[in-house]
């Protein structure tokens, strides 16, 4: 009997990848494994940029998690513990330490950006003991207990599933917070003391016990694994599934999980947080564009909880951080050769980069950025074509308000307020206050405008159904603005004068009250909001092509559009014909570059008006003479 050869056990593929400033286990080419966020964090570390240290659990673990009935694969715990030990060494802090506690964020990261669709937990690692240690070491108990109440609320929502029953109900944690702020005359936590925040922690924990029947978890490692499981679980939540369906993203990709040492923008006047773009994501203009908040955490900006300040004012508020940020954003755009969306936090004057990714943009911006980057010799014309989603060009055809109708609305005093022009075009629709109502009424053929205090990822289907989105909170980088730009929806965000009452289904502004079903109009060019309906007319691109409007043909937007089409004509190897059933359709097709008619369905012509009667007579004719007489 031949002797059997011994075989070695197949080594388990690496599943956890660490990173810190100047060194990383990964790079930007590993998005399939590390997700977009993890790959770009690693890349920024390799560039030597100031990034908080952390580690990424790969997308393969997400796949294994679902394949094994939502259980973590064997050996993962040991890998995470090794990465956690490395993170402790990098920060000089201890996870669960009662002297110098390490806190972490736990964030999702698919290989393509899915803004707000999956879950995040900040300030993880806090409990009664570590919060006291953080208060002592920072010398700032108010900051420590502010972070603690944020953590309990976020963990309660994301991991423990404590949420409003519907979009028309309020978050139970927010109800308690708002009642306290009303009693203290505070807004956005600014008038609350350390004792107030400590009281909120106790109240939030009571909500957790009441809703779950269990106490809030005190063990940081239990918290960590709960958050990791929740982030993997969020890959299959309703809003993520809907977003993937809308954007043709395969469900098999999965998400990575990024565990990163916390840096704090809520330490006081020398701290802050923001989101910015290396170019204007609405227009494509080459200018550093974004928003920030002083004494805040990142979710305050993205979730639209407070209306932030324009990024340019950071130069006066924190000049040293501004100068460094300006240099970094320019370097990142050069490195990636595309417009970048960045997130940052300033902790006691020191800048940290938390994320960079290719920025979502409107069709207007996509065309302008592509054309200008070719002129700047950063990309080729072929690369420019590949960067423009053909569907996004439809946004360039979005209507604008008829000037005379708009002037009449202003003259009649129908202008209600002005917010931030966060999404392109102009639209009128009937007011709805919930995403579900937007879906139902749009399905019935109505044009609706979704009006919310702020949108959340759960509103994704309603946003898709609406012709426009209006929020009273949030800025140009809020969830509403980001998603609206990507969808090409008209959006006005941060219209702070609006007083929205979900229960009464009414919005009050400047002495007027608009009810559900009333008409409202949004001007995406400047952020104006009007009562009633306003007529629209073709966009400058449509006017230039279809109406031979000379002024429109001189517009920068049309010139960029024409340049893209010229490059496309030069690159293509196919001739383009159109399907058209009517003479006016042929005219439109030829104006947009069609070289002929590919298919003409004559039955559509014959079915119009009174043409159907002679056609029937012709078909039923029994002789040539009758047929000729019918025609």
Language-model features: where?
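Nucleotide/phosphate-binding sheet-loop regions of phosphoryl- and nucleotidyl-transfer enzymes
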Residues: 2-410, 442, 446-449, 456-461, ...
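Long, charged amphipathic helices and adjacent flexible linkers at domain junctions
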Residues: 244-249, 385-441, 446-448, 528-572
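A generic local structural motif
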Residues: 435-438, 455-457, 477, 507-508, ...
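Structural loop-to-beta junction motif characteristic of Rossmann-like glycosyltransferase folds
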Residues: 488-490
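Solvent-exposed beta-strand/loop surfaces of large extracellular or lumenal domains
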Residues: 492-503
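Aromatic/His-enriched, Gly/Pro-containing loop or helix-boundary segments
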Residues: 503-511
